Structures are given as structure tokens and as C-alpha cells.
Amino acid sequence: RIDVLKDASATALYGTRAANGVIVITTKKGAVGPARFSYNHSSKYTRRPRYTDRNINLMNSQQRVQFGKELSDLHYQFPSDMTMVGYEGALNSYYKGLSTYDEFVNSVKWYETVNTDWFDILTQDTYSHDHTFGVSGGNDDIRYYVSAGYNKEDGVSKTTYTERYTALVNLDMTFSKIVKAHFSMNGNVQKKNHLMSEIDAMDYAYNTTRALPCFNPDGTLYYYDKSAYGRTNKPYNKFRYSILNEIENSSNEYDGSTIGAMLKVTPITGLDISVSGNYNRSNTLQEQWWGEKTHYVARWKNGEYEEVPMPGEAGSCYLPYGGILKTTNSITESYTFRTQVDYRLLFGENQQHMFMLMGGFELNGNTSRGISDENRGFVKDRGLQFIDNLQNLDDYPEYKKWLNKNHRSLSHGISHQISGYFVLSYSYRNHFTLNLNGRFDASNKFGSRSNERFLPVWSVSGSWNLQENILKNVEFISELRLRGSFGIQGNMLEDQSPNLIIKQGALDPIYNENVSSIARYPNPNLRWEETQQLDGGLEIGFFRSRLSMEFSVYSKKTSNCFTNVQVSSVNGVAGHTYVMNGGDLNNNGYSISLSATPVKTKDFQWKFSTYYSGNFNKVQTKSVENYTLNDYLNGTALIDGVAIGSFYSYKYLGLNPSNGTPLFDDYNDRKHLLEYKTLEETVLMTMEKSGQREPIFSGNFSNNFTYKNFSLSMNLSYSIGSKVRLFPLYSPVVSGVS
């Protein structure tokens, strides 16, 4: 079962980790009785993009060739280093005398009709599926639940996938009336294959002209010259490129594999003392490979696959033979130790009063170790070997310099946290309940300044059962409950310190001295980010809860919000960011949920539920001069009195009646009004708010059909109110392949 806890009362128990809410996952347990077998299956279908989609308005090959011809007829001067394909490529070849006029005409006709479907070639409709098989049973002394699962998720980009095997064992044991134990063990093995970050298939499919062939008429891959980087002996710094060749000769593989126990003691009636411990260990291996036939390796080789690299400094060769293999191996170990006491007391003539006290301490630890390495000269298709013992190493001085450097890096991280928490609760019959929750956290990752001020997390909450008190005799109302809560949460960033943090480096062979660099600036004045939250709600149930509704409202105020500010280069590190308490953020919202069971028979049941919510926020902050114009255009600037994520655009004045081009208000005739204005004041005067990136309203519809032991679920989620900028009509022609 998955529960989402958002109010202050629920999140107070989870401390600083719960600043944005809590997701609680409860695994299944065994029940007394003979063995019961279960099977659960879920599926997901994802549709790939298509050129016929409304939001994909791209030229076909004939339109793109015509567009290139119009540019040429207008004597548009193409950049000399532009990738020449399509009409521009055919025309350039003709002008250079590399083809006749008839060949030029035939090439243009071919480009007009090729109409490459890049979305079909590079992406796919996907079907993902999840299977879980379980068995449970037991007697009064021992109960068990064992499950095994398999999950396969294919990515929209072809050749990408995630595959996972899982196993779970839950044992509940009763040794006596006062000694009980729960043991749980789980594990998973997963394998992933993603495209290299340099190969963005979706972006390539959207931004590449359909007049660019993917295959030659004989079915072989079509290559075109694409720009590279660095010094090169190739004309205009270009090497052959085919995205299918890059995908076929590269891989980004991830292999990972990832136990818990709890002892519960009940010494006296009404008092539970539980001690639990949990240990997890995960081991991951990531391998990134670039083959020697790829454009990526050609840039480092400074030559094509079949070419011998030019020797000497002029050759600028960083990889004479083979490909590149990058490996990262990491091990993460974590543990949790918890001691908890639960006490319940019933008193009164009819035991109508109930008092409950729960308290405990929790200790968490996490250790991570990793090693990364890069090796060149790797040949995957010849027995996973490396090319070594190069006799002519001096012919490639750049590669020799690279070999003399250390390309192995190690990482080691340790974190410890100790927490204490309590819950104090009182209830009278089933009429009303009052709760007081609290928690504190201390960690080696909070920074020493934050621990100087003790800021616990606490909340108070209550609920009143109106149905029992006021509408007890109204039969069609089965539940009517009013609830409310108020709480305070604190948050501190892990990597901030009042002291300057220096990263110690290795020996510099030039100066024969150990070197160091600035890792974090001192931040002695950073304060806790504090959130006060007030929640209220009303729950109504009709006809024995066949129909139920819930109304919720909340008001959340976060003070001393963390914000990143650019630090001037005079501080020693250009472009570095500094964390400050940048102001306050007010969030107000509501939610409405409805659930119903329209059909319920002995074997069949249909449940329907819907949820709708709205959120309205406003920033209260002073102007920060370190924002740039792009921050206002992208919506990353915080502006006083404006919702977070709001972005601005130049004021549109309409179309120019003489030539049809768009007109914008540039304040050219009122420049004097902008004198001595800050950037924020200038933006607010000359631009207009276009919207905000985050949705204002969101909701979902859910249907669940159950027939005997089979169930089928369908969910639809939506969001309203967010805005994004439109895609550009076309990419800059300078790229050549757009």
C-alpha cells in the first residue's frame, strides 16, 4: 500500500526529510491459514511522437528543399563551415564543380522525395509490464509472505530499456504472549541500457531535416560530414556522421543489485516495546563505451576509422587506435536502528477515554564508496581487449600526454543522523481526537551552524466526528468528520558550513607542491528554512461509505527560503553560486476528492474516484541584483509578489503593416524612462508576464474493476495552468541539418 502524507501532523514524525511531504510504502504480510497464491500484473503503453501530432509542426522534405532554394535565390550567404546536406549540399557540390548540372537536379529530386521519418527510425511505441507472484499463509506461531517479481520498461528511444527482478520475504513470528518478531528480506537485480548523453535521439528526430537521408538507395547507412572540435587536419573540422552508427557502436549499460529485521516485545498489557534494525547494501556498475567507428572517437583520433592518424604535433591525435571505455563502480551501505515505545490506556466507567503515548529514537547511517576510470584503445569486438605496447608512442604526443595523467577518481561519503520523536494522543469514544507530534534531527550533514539552534519539528491536530454527535440518526450519512492541524517544519541544506571548505588536491608536478581549491564558501549567516502549515478538512460518507467526499484547504508559509545567487568572480571562483535566505513563500490551496462504488455484487465491484486541487503561491522577497535577463525570460528569477516560476516576454505590438514582420516594444523612444533603473525594474516596465511554469490546478480520474480475484485499474491524470514557450518554427539554418 502507498500512502501520501502532506499535512503538518503527518510529516512531523519524519523530520527534516519531510519538508515536501512523505510517501509511505507498506509491504504485504502473511495471514493465518493455508497457502494462498496471488498474481498481480500492470501494464503501461507509451506512444512515440509522430509528424502528424498537433504539437509537431515540421516541414516535410519537399518543403525543406523549397525553403533552401528560396534562401539561395535571395543570395543568403551560408556559413563556410556549415554542414552541407539537402538542397544546400547539392548546390554547394555543383558550385565547386564536384557534380554536373544533371547530377545536381537528380540530387534535388531525391532530397525532395526522401522524406525521412526520423521519429519512426529512432523512437518506438513502448509496452511496459510488471508481474508479481506471491504466496502467503501460516499458523498462530509463524506467518509468511514470499513474492517474486519481474519488471520490463522499454524506453521511447530505441535500444533503451530497464529490466528488474525483485524478491521479498516477510516472516511474522510469535514466540509467546510477550515476545513477537518480524523479519523481512528483500532484494533486486536490475539492468539498464540508455543512450549516451551525447546522443539525444528525441532531440535529433525533432530538429533534423526530413530532406536528410538515413539510408543510401542500396540500403547502406548514409553519412554526412559533421563538425567536430579542437585542432584538426580535416577540412573545416568535420568527420562522417550517422546517428544510427553512433547508436550501434556505443553503449551505456548499468548493472545493479541491492536485508531488515525487527524484534517486538510486549512486557505488560498496553505497553509495546519494539526494537528494529535494517541494513541495505547496493552495488552498481556502469560501463560507457564508444566504438572506434563512431564520430565521437573520430574527433579524438583526428581521423576516420580506416585512416592512420597523422603523427606529430600537427596531427593532434588523442587516441590513435581503438575506442573509449569509461567505468564507474559504486557501493552504498545504509543502516537504521530504531527503539520505540507504545503505551495505550483506557479508563472511565465504560472505558470511553483513551490515552496513547508513542516515543522513540532512530539512528541512521549511510556510507558510499565509488571508483571511476577511463581507458582508451579499447576494442570490444575482439575479445574485450585493450591495444597496448604501441611502439611509436612518440608519434602521438597528445596521446602520450593523456597517458601520463591519472584518469582514475575515488569518492567516499559518510552521513550519520540521530532523531527522536513522540506522539501524544487523546480520544473520547469515537467523538473527537487530539494529537501532539514532535521530532528533532541532528546530523553531521546539516552544517555546524544549523546545529547551534535547536529547531524541532512539531504539530498539533484534531478531529471531530460530527456524525456521532449531531447526525447520529441520519441513516444515509455514514460519516461526517471535521479535522484540522497546525505544524512547523524546519529544513537545512546538507552541504553548507560557517567555515570555508577547502578541497585538497594532489601533488602538482610543475610546482612540486600540493594544491587545493575552494569547494564551499563560508556561510555563517545561513538560517533554517522554516515552514508553518495550517490544514483543515471535512470528510463526508453516504450510504455506508458507498459514496464519500473530502474537502481540504491549507495555508503554508515558508520563511527564509533558500535561493542560489551568483557570486562575482572577484571571490576567486567565476560563476560560482552562493546560498542565501532569500525571502518568504506563501502557498495556499485546496483539494476536492470524490470516491464511489456504483456497482457492488458478490463477485464484481466497480470503484470510481476523482481528485481535483488548486495551488496558488506568491513570493515575498527583496530584489536580487545577481539575476540575469535570461533568469526573467526562463522563470528562474524570484520577484516580490509574483508566483514562483513566472516568466516574462517582450511586449508584442502586432505585425508590421509594410512587410508582415512582428513588432515589439523596445522602448527606443523612451530610453530616458529606464535610466538608473535596476534590471528587475526595467524588466517589469518593458516586458509582460506570460505565465508560470508550474500548474495551478491538477487532478485525476481512477477506475478499479474487481471480479473475484482479478482486478483492473485505469488512471488519468491532468494539470492545468502551466505555460511553456512554443517550439521555434525552425532551428538556425547555420546547423545545416535542421
Task: Describe the residue ranges of each PLM region.
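Conserved small-residue
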Residues: 40-109, 364, 371-379, 583, ...
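Extracellular/periplasmic, surface-exposed regions of secreted and cell-surface proteins
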Residues: 164, 170-179, 185-189, 234-290, ...
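Extracytoplasmic gating/loop element in the C-terminal half of outer-membrane beta-barrel translocons
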Residues: 106, 296-300, 304-310, 719-738
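Outer-membrane beta-barrel transmembrane strand signature
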Residues: 90-136, 143-147, 219-266, 399-423, ...
